[in-house]
Structure formats: structure tokens, C-alpha cells
Amino acid sequence: YRLADAEVPAMIASLRRIAERQLAEVERIVRDNFESRDALQPVRREELLKMARRGEAMVIDVRPAEEYEAGHIAGAVNVPLDALPRFLKKLPQEQEIVAYCRGPYCMLAYEAVERLRKKGYRARRLEEGFPEWQAGHLPVEK
């Protein structure tokens, strides 16, 4: 898929925040389905920017290739979830790996982090996804 305008991700992020504030059911769903999957604190965008500048993190975009090609976090490497086993030997052991996908409720990043940790990698997920990153006017590439 492709978001035609930078305002679209901002609108989606706003709608998500409104739903989170207005619907008690959203809080329960998030707690039951997401927070229980990942005991480690996710990486906030400010932290990721600092880590990347210092060379402390490798950022992987686990979305399908066509989504990555439409736009991605600057410096991120595309490692679609189904291709992760083939990329394992290319991933650095000395750096933390930060995975992201379509947003805070996208299961791809959770799954990638879980698989990486089982293989001995230090991995966390980005707290948000590419749409929120782009809406925040942070560095992106195409």
C-alpha cells in the first residue's frame, strides 16, 4: 500500500490516539494482546535517533518490500518477517536491533523481536511505526 500524502499518516495517528482515549475496550485489547508479548520497554523515537547516530543500533523494517520501497526510516534495512531466517547471519551481534513496521499495533515487529531474542540477539521494537515516524517529520528515505 502507499500513503499518498504526509498528512494521511498524521490523520491515522490522530484517529488512533482518539480511539485509545475514548474506548476502554482498546485499553483492554492492547494490554491483553500487545503488552503481554513484550516485557522490554520499546524504543522511543528520540532514543532511536540517538542510538543510530552513535552506531549502537541496527534498524530493520519488517514490512513487505513494496511498503519499504514506498518509504522507510532513513538507514533502515528491509528484512521482511518471512525472510528473517535468511538474514540472521548478516545481523550484528554487537548492536541492538530495533524492528519496526506499520504502527504500534502491528504484530510484525513483535514477532520479529521475539524470533531475534530466541536466537540470542538483543532486540527491541520501535514504540511506533513508519506512519508515525513520517508524520513526526523525522528522516525518511525512498
Residue positions per predicted region:
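Flexible, polar/low-complexity N-terminal or interdomain linker segments that lie immediately upstream
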Residues: 4-70, 142
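Residue-level signal for well-ordered alpha-helical positions
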Residues: 14-15, 71, 90, 136
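Positively charged, proline/Ser/Thr-rich regional signature most characteristic
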Residues: 44-111, 142
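Residue-level detector of anion-binding/catalytic polar loops
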Residues: 58, 122, 139
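Hydrophobic alpha-helical packing residues
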Residues: 115-117
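A short glycine-rich beta-strand->turn/loop micro-motif centered on a GG-aromatic cluster
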Residues: 120-135
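Short, basic/aromatic-enriched C-terminal tail that caps enzymatic domains
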Residues: 136-142
